[in-house]
Amino acid sequence: MIRTSSHVLNVQENIMTSNCASSPYSCEATSACAEAQQVMIDNFVFFHMYNADIQIDAKLQCGVRSAAFAMIDDKHLEMYKHRIENKFFYYYDQCADIAKPDRLPDDDGACCHHFIFDAQRIIQCIKEIESAYGVRDRGNVIVFYPYLKQLRDALKLIKNSFACCFKIINSMQMYVNELISNCLLFIEKLETINKTVKVMNLFVDNLVLYECNVCKEISTDERFLKPKECCEYAICNACCVNMWKTATTHAKCPACRTSYK
């Protein structure tokens, strides 16, 4: 949808324009909003990472989000001749196996004062990337949103431990919080785009419906139905669970009576 969504936004713009007379906003404002949404889509930095399973594959989602941190890491290598080495400032994705640190490391009583300088370098890398974005691709800062939230939490932990560097840490926090606020503005625009696309997709001819032969419920999500193991009889996951609850040994297909695994 990313590369063909211009029709969506053009239609939205026409709808907005036709309602200008009754809207509290000017026609120019609504038109500019639609144009900004289109620009945000057309210049998205990771549009090439689309995969048909991206909405259901957690590993793919993790890979896309991690690509944003890789951009920061690459910039760190470019600016400081080495990659980010402090694991405290790594990106820990919500779908990954490793949880993010919730406190500063205290092994062997090692000093963590250098964490402040590590954070400064990382933030400088983000600033360099951000400043390179022009007006048309400014929306790409949204890709840093997951990492910025982790960085905000990390700075809070550091601030509580090193009161002597309050001003330096406070300055970093102000920048990170401001960038997070900018990300939230773009997320709001993205939510508007998503709502419009969902409505427009109702008019696409290739819409597939999945119906359970037991309860007759219908869904547009292919995961709604249990994978077929025996015959073509379709059964949803909820009905399958109910069959297992009432089965003496194994649940069986209502059509061919084959036992489910």
UniProtKB/Swiss-Prot annotation:
It is found in: Host nucleus; Host cytoplasm; Virion. This is Immediate-early protein IE-0. One of its GO terms (cellular component) is host cell cytoplasm. One of its GO terms (molecular function) is zinc ion binding. Interacts with proteins C42 and FP25. Interacts with host beta-tubulin. Interacts with Ac66 and vUb. A zinc finger (RING-type) spans 212-257. GO terms for biological process: DNA replication; viral DNA genome replication. Pfam families: Baculo_IE-1. It comes from Autographa californica nuclear polyhedrosis virus (AcMNPV). Its main location: host cell. Keywords: DNA replication, Early protein, Host cytoplasm, Host nucleus, Metal-binding, Transcription, Transcription regulation, Viral DNA replication, Virion, Zinc, Zinc-finger. Putative viral E3 ligase that plays an essential regulatory role in both viral DNA replication and transcriptional transactivation. The role in transcription has been shown to include activation of gene expression from early viral promoters. Also promotes the efficient egress of nucleocapsids from the host nucleus. May act as an E3 ligase that promotes ubiquitination of nucleocapsids proteins by vUbi and subsequent viral egress for the host nucleus.
